[in-house]
Amino acid sequence: MITLLLAAAAAQPATTDPLAPLPQPQVTAPQLQTPKPQSDKPRMAPTQAPAIVAAPATTVPTSWREVFDGIRAGNWASAQAGIAALPQDLITPVAKAELYTAKGSPTVDLQSLQSLIAQAPELPDADQLARMAVTRGATTTPLIIPEKPTVGLGSAPSRYRARPVSGEPLADALRTQLDGYVKADDAANAEAAFLVQAPYLSADARAEAAQRVAWIYYVLGQDFEARRVADYWRTGASGEWGSQASWIAGLASWRLGDCNSAAREFRDVAANGTQRELIAAGYYWAARAEQACRRPQAVQGLLKAAASSAESFYGLLARETLGTETRLPPAPTVSTAAVDALPNVRRAVELAKIGENALAEEMLRHQAKIGSPADQPALLEIAKRLNLAGAQYWLATNGQPGVRIAAAERYPSPSWAPVRGWRVKPDLAFAHIIQESNFRSTAVSPAGAVGLMQVRPGSASDEANAAGMSFSPSSLYDPSYNLEYGQSFIERMRRSAYTGDQLPKVIASYNAGPLPVGRWSTIPDKGDPLLWIESVPYWETRYYVPAVMRNLWVYEGLGNEPQPSLKLLAQHRWPGFPAVR
């Protein structure tokens, strides 16, 4: 770092360009004077001249990384000096844009804004810079390269909470009333409240409320009551809530040993569901029910229907049962020649070299929005090459209409490692990361969980202390530290007496914590891990466990590794924690 002393900066005229070189202090040569003769009068005490206080030193960055650090720290003068001093290159417009748009940064004049936009109209911040120019007096909006609309390109099947029925005030009021009963596991009062309003609700609203009441009975182990409520009130419902009620009725029938009713209800789930993962689950469990009823002729067709969802939890279980391929096709090799020379791609490469990964990812995402749809596979290949897993995941799941990306690209496998090395299988950590953050290293949840594995600062501090490591909250944004704390928490959950080294319970503990998993040891699952998963009271954890396990199996398949937990679950046996290879 170079230090400039701006002792006389206050005496210089203000510059309008925030990036102009900082003024240098002026030195005035002393004037020679003829000494005056001394007087015989008593001498007065000399008046002391005011002390000259030097202006604070400004540190001039010697690298672009230091410039970006200065901007984030609010050291505006330092950042300005660095931008002015460093050689002008591809990163210069990025640094200027970051400075100009940073909250609290010095007001930039119109000429500087217009100059930057003209130089780099393809920047991600170009639109914001153009709007700033208008507020500074631009008579016309500066020309930029606009973003084009993007759409979702598809994702792995997943379970999610069904949308509440809308447009019925009575249903809204009942939903709020039932919330308290669900939390208290108070099935009797929940059903009583529902029956008061049932005559005034639509068929779908009745099915929604009945499903919630039935679920309380199911969690309490009162399977007859759960099936009674779900079966009766799903009549006449269409689509999502009818299939949700059928699902609970099917699970209750299965636990009651009624394979005929279970087969019928699970078939209804598959026929009327709208969620791909739930449809596959309906087919798979219907096959189990038919097998339990000794009707093997019906089993294979149902398993094949489930297996058609090749990237789903139950689809992969069905494929393993049928003995068909459980591995996704690998992603094709793509040439990047068409995009290598694009300014934003070149900037991404340079930014990644200096560790500015978030900015590098932003360059690639923005290029996908302003460029040709045909370029997206090459942009994704660049992201993989640069280890920008967050950009890879985004480019695999978002793009302009018409973009086609292989499903395998939705499973980034960056060459990252925890600071103390891998102690859990990397595939398992990455399987969690997809569900936790979609590989966004800067992600922060409303609850304060941070980074790739959504680690809470308090938990990370505990893990760091246990390992004899120093801890800084900012380290959670660093993949190597975030992975370290995440895998340490997985290890702790594995050692917990509540999980018994059983993989589904370890995964559940990562999401819900060990104490709830300990309470769930009383779930009447008949030793069946799939039934245990589907009976977990927390909906988020109930959907989280299959998603992480599916991700793990896909990673193992793409790496041509064995899939031991898939094989064991297909045999309805509890899988243990995977070993590190």
Q: How does the language model describe each region?
A:
Residues 7-62, 139-171, 180-183, 574-580:
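Compositionally biased, proline/threonine/alanine/serine-rich low-complexity intrinsically disordered stretches
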Residues 32-51, 62-65, 72-108:
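N-terminal, post-signal-peptide region of Sec/Tat-exported proteins
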Residues 49-57, 80-90, 101-104, 115-123, ...:
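Solenoid-like repeat scaffolds
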Residues 61-78, 164-192, 213-216, 220, ...:
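Alpha-helical segment of the N-proximal tetratricopeptide repeat
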Residues 97-99, 110-119, 123, 132, ...:
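Catalytic glycan-binding domains that act on GlcNAc-containing polysaccharides
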Residues 307, 311, 316, 320-351, ...:
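Extracellular/periplasmic ectodomains of large secreted or surface enzymes and adhesion receptors
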